[in-house]
Every structure is written in C-alpha cells, then in structure tokens.
A protein has these predicted regions:
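Flexible, glycine-rich loop/tail regions that form catalytic "lids" or insertion modules at the edges
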Residues: 1-47, 54-58, 62-65, 111, ...
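Glycine-rich phosphate-binding active-site loops on the catalytic face of alpha/beta enzymes
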Residues: 122-140
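Glycine-/small-residue-rich beta-strand-loop submotif within the FAD-binding core of flavoenzymes
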Residues: 88-100, 134-155
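Conserved structured catalytic cores and adjacent interaction surfaces
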Residues: 42-43, 50-53, 58-115, 122
Length: 233
C-alpha cells in the first residue's frame, strides 16, 4: 500500500502503452502531462523555469507520474531539447527533495538512436515513448517499404533499442535498467560549464563549448527550417 509500483516490460513504450498510462485510474497513482514546448519568442531559459513551475504544481496536486511531452509543436511553438528537459527537471526535483516521489516519462519525437535513449534514461527518465519513430514505422508499413506487421516492427525496434541500452550498461558493470536510470555515467564534450552546472549537475566535462543561448539558436534554426520547407511544399 505504501510502495506501489508500476511495472513495464520495456522502458521503450509503444503509443498504446503510453495511452494506457495516461488513462490509468489506479489508487495511489496520479498522472500529469507537462508540455515541454514553448512559444518561439520566449527564451529557452524561461521555458525551462516554466517547466519547473509546472512540475512543482503537479507535485502539489498529488501527481507522482510526470509525462514530459513535446506533442503540439507547430509553427509558433518549439520544443525544449528532450535530454535538456529531462536532466534539468531531474536536477530540480533532486534539489527540492521531490525526486523519489515522482516518476518521469518522456513522450518525444526526438529520440531515435540507442545513444539518445541511453542518455535519457541515464539522466532521469524512467521510460520513453518515441512516437515519431513509431509513426515512421507505420508509414513504412503502409507504403509497403517494410515487409512486416506494424506491431511486430515496433516490437523489434523497441527490443533492439533495449538490447543496445543493456549492452551500454553492462560495459559499466550495471546489471539492471533500474540501476542505470539516473546514473549519469556520461562525460560531456563541448558544453559550457554554466549549462553543465545548472542542468547536468556533477557530469564530468573537461572541454567547454556551447552555451544555453547557442542551444536555443540551434532549436530555432531547426524549427524554422522545418516549417519553411512545409510552407514551400
């Protein structure tokens, strides 16, 4: 009763898995979806601060499963980079002594490679729903570019990602995904010390580099390129 646990077979969630979690009505669990998108004329730093405010509000309201979602991106809204959002919120929850009371799930179109998932789990995510990958798989199946059932193809992808994460963890002497979560066993290269100290606290970083403003500019450039190309289609 005092230690209820939601168990999933794979930390890489299908769209159906996440839908079930969002709709869950089980005593002891309360789910809250927190957007990690922001208006494009807002600074990235303010957007992250707003994420902290929303997480604190959800915690006060009794939520113990936070789903960080970048769904809703449009021509006026850009996403906080998923790893930055996850790690920043992880550090905020640790500093405010809330981390052990809250699980963090990411719903994002950004992660697609094993390293993406490995870093997201390593910096605090408990599970990840790569919805854009699954939408892409569906399109490939529908266009007969993939000779496989959609659900089987998604399952194969999820298992391949999980096997890759397990391989990374095992090289570090970690035997379970649960032990790997939040372990921060990575070294950062090319990120400014202020960004590391504030959002990736205690991560080893011997070489400085891009600032938060540089990251914001990159996000805006990618967003503009995506929507300009759509306008010209």
């Amino acid at each position: 009763e005092n230690c209820q646990v939601l168990k999933v077979n794979n930390p890489i969630l299908t769209n159906t898995d996440l839908m079930k979690i969002k709709a869950m009505k089980v005593p002891g669990f309360k789910v809250e979806v927190i957007p990690i998108i922001y208006y494009k004329n807002t600074s990235l730093e303010k957007a992250i601060d707003r994420l902290f405010v929303e997480a604190d509000r959800a915690y006060r309201d009794g939520a113990n499963i936070l789903i960080l979602s970048d769904r809703g991106i449009d021509e006026n809204h850009v996403p906080i980079p998923s790893l930055l959002a996850v790690s920043a919120l992880q550090q905020h929850l640790v500093r405010t002594k809330k981390r052990t009371s809250v699980a963090m799930i990411l719903e994002s179109g950004e992660p697609r490679e094993v390293h993406h998932f490995a870093t997201l789990l390593g910096y605090g995510a408990c599970a990840i729903n790569p919805y854009l990958v699954q939408d892409t798989v569906k399109q490939l199946v529908d266009e007969h570019m993939l000779d496989k059932d959609y659900y089987a193809a998604v399952q194969d992808y999820n298992n391949a990602i999980l096997n890759g994460i397990v391989k990374i963890a095992s090289k570090m002497g970690i035997s379970t995904i649960q032990s790997y979560e939040g372990s921060k066993i990575f070294e950062a290269i090319g990120i400014d010390k202020n960004v590391i100290d504030k959002y990736f606290t205690n991560t080893v970083s011997r070489i400085g580099g891009i600032t938060l403003k540089d990251i914001e500019n990159d996000v805006n450039e990618l967003h503009s390129a995506a929507y300009l190309s759509l306008i010209h289609i």
